[in-house]
Amino acid sequence: MLACGCALSLPAGLWAQPSSTPPAATPATVGSQPATPAPDPQQQRVAAAAALAIARVAQADLRLNGGPDERDFWIAAQMLGIASTLNPKDADILRLLIEAEGGAGESDEVDRLSRRLLELDPQDTVTQLRVISDAISNHQRVEGRLAAYDRFLGQEGRNLDASVRSRLALDAALLAREMGDIEGFARRLTMATELDKTNKDAATLALTFFAARTNDAVGRLELLINVLVADPFDQDVVLAIGRELSTQGAFTGAARFYAYYQTLCAIRGVEMDPLATNELQVVDWMTNGAQSFVDRATSAIEDDRAETMRQRERAKAAGVEEDQLPDPQSRRLPVDTERLRVLASIAIGRADQIDYAVREMNETIERSKAEILDLHRQQELGMDEKAVKEFLRVMTQESTWLRIWAGRDLDGAARDLAQLKSEPATDPRDVQRMEAWLKIRRGQLDEAETELRALKDESLAQVGLATIAELRGRTVEALDQYLAIAQRAPGSPAGAFALTRAEILNEQAGAPRKIEESATAKRLDALALGVPDWLEGMAESPLEFETLQADIVPPESGMLGVLDRLVMRVRLRNTSRMPLGLGPDRPLNSRLLLVPTVRVGSETVRRPSLHGVVNIDRRLRLMPREEMTINVLADNGAVGLLLQETLRDGINVRYRVLQGFRSNRGMFEEGPQCLSLETNGVMRPSSRYAYATASELESVFDKGSPMEVAEAALAMRDRVGTASAERFSGEEAQSLLDALLRRFPHLSRDGKLLLLAILPNSSAMTAMDRLDDVAQHDPDPMVVRFTMMARLPGVDAHALQESQWIGNDLMARTAKAVRERLADNRRTFARPRLPGDAADTPSSPDASPAK
């Protein structure tokens, strides 16, 4: 059996390790193996508490430097390796260790530790994939790697989860392409898409590969829908589907997907692409008719102006000065919409509509030109003189062309055209087309026809030729020409204009032509409308496809102890009718922000950076109705340190959980298609030693269990550091420290490490340099190694001299890394303050300054 629980006959050499050579020395093995097992529950509790405390220190150490480098990650990995050795069954600590080793660039360690993680969580398909991929990559030859992939994709891998095999198939496909085997690439890529519909990378690659090799619009749409199935909320894919449908004349389906794209943009709070907005309006024109489009565009802007006028009147009545009031005429349609309204009005042929549309369009363009001439506006847009000049030229060309097409203000348009013709940036073909159309509007049809035919297949030139036929009274000829344009350029403004004119002429001529969708457009519409309509519902409400629950798991006693871990149980369920990918950027978002509310007594703690992030990507996907339940460590980091240092009052902790979180005006909120929730609360009472006398604490140090000693040590820290009446005297503090130092050598390794991880070091409390000195001379290398990394603030410390570790490579490397980091003036847990830091800089992450 594999560690992943799959009954496979392993390919020879795939995962095998040399049997004659012991494993390489690692941070978790050198000098760190317990002399004897510790089956005693009390001893296991001490080890677990020490592991958790060390993990907190490692995470805090990383946070002290905004951008940790490989050395920072390596040191954190050494601490986490110690923690994982103390509690080898703690998957949360092991995951942190793997992450740190990855940041340190230790790929071999990531591979080894991932195998360990798979033993703890055999259902973790993300780790399964990583372990198998790493094993295959160990083959030196490409042919060997490809053969290994194929064995996993054959009968030997039949028990692997399909989501894992799908990604292995994709990797194999890419390897085959690298070898020049295009047929093998295509075969394995197809297998990848068939094994797991949520494999978006495979679906996207299949689209790119197969679409480039076919002119079949139906096939391209099917490939696009495959990508949509892999990620139903990818707005770029949704837009691509809308465009594919529109350019093939399948406007019913196109309208649906452009509307879906609009919905996704609104949910994400992003503006629609301007080109997509224009395309959506063309589809609107084609599905609802030119007159409907004109009426709704006009109503929208007129309603906007009416509301602006009402606001103006209300402000005026309130005494606002006239020059500060909004101008209703400043409310304009975008230039692209103005253009379409002019074209639709021309296509309909109503003179009053054309006059109004052209007048509005000219006013919009003139206002745009005036705005861009304002120097402040140019600075806001980052436009230089050249960019401004080009903007003015483009706007003039837009106005000139539409006036010519509409047959309005031809003399003014002719003057502007002459000016445009002299501009080097103006395309000569645009000039030729506009000159030909100007001749159409002036009745010079023969000359115009000659010039337009020279432009060959340009759509607007073809529209001009159809217009000439219409003006000559050749209705059926014009009708056929318009239909040809509409079929050749569906979804474009020219195609929309041509189809509208064709429909009008066909009706006038007694319907000699049957105007309907092409066979291809009908098939595409059927495919598009066959996509289940609950897809849009999923986008609008995450409750349509997932449920998320999170609860703090209460300890057996019902209340947290001072050194207990805070565990949150998370349940994520796919409630949709389709498989959904799980991950940080997948439909089921795996990133959770845990925002705690901590009440100490009756006061709510206000402290920055209490929140933490967890990633629950233990699966590549969840099938319909499948639920994943996992436990995550909720108190690793700032909250854990707060629980350790606050002893005299009871603490209540609850969390707000934000899935796929994002920042909005300085506040965190759940991301698009994501959920948020509030957990239950858990109570941690005040410490039993919070108000103990110095003699009582000294007695615990002398006779107490390791857990009692640790809790009493925290109480000592609290009472020595406080400024209140409960503060111990200097003599009492000295006596307590003496007692603790007497007990320290007699504690187990776990007990020593627990104390070293929870007590302040000498940077935070000067008197602790005595403990640090004892610890750096301890006979246990693991105790010394942790002391090096977490408690020694000076490069001249005895344990940081490489000369002390001749023959012990790991200890020497650790000493060198810590010493170099200190010399580089990096903030560390052992030395969180640097010269020049403010006096109130915390002495440890998220902790109060030392008293």
Question: In which residue ranges do the predicted regions lie?
Answer:
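Structural detector for internal amphipathic alpha-helices that build alpha-solenoid repeat scaffolds
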Residues: 96-103, 130-134, 171-175, 205-212, ...
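N-terminal leader/linker segments that initiate helical-solenoid repeat arrays
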Residues: 14-96, 103, 107, 112, ...
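TPR alpha-solenoid repeat register
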Residues: 93, 127, 168, 201-203, ...
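Short beta-strand elements
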Residues: 661-707
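The feature marks short-to-medium sequence segments in extracytoplasmic or secretory-pathway proteins
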Residues: 577-627
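Short coil turns that delineate tetratricopeptide repeat
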Residues: 88, 122-123, 157, 163, ...
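Alpha-helical repeat scaffolds
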Residues: 73-80, 108-119, 142-157, 182-194, ...
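Low-complexity, acidic Ser/Thr/Pro/Gly-rich terminal tails and inter-domain linkers that flank the onset
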Residues: 503-562, 693
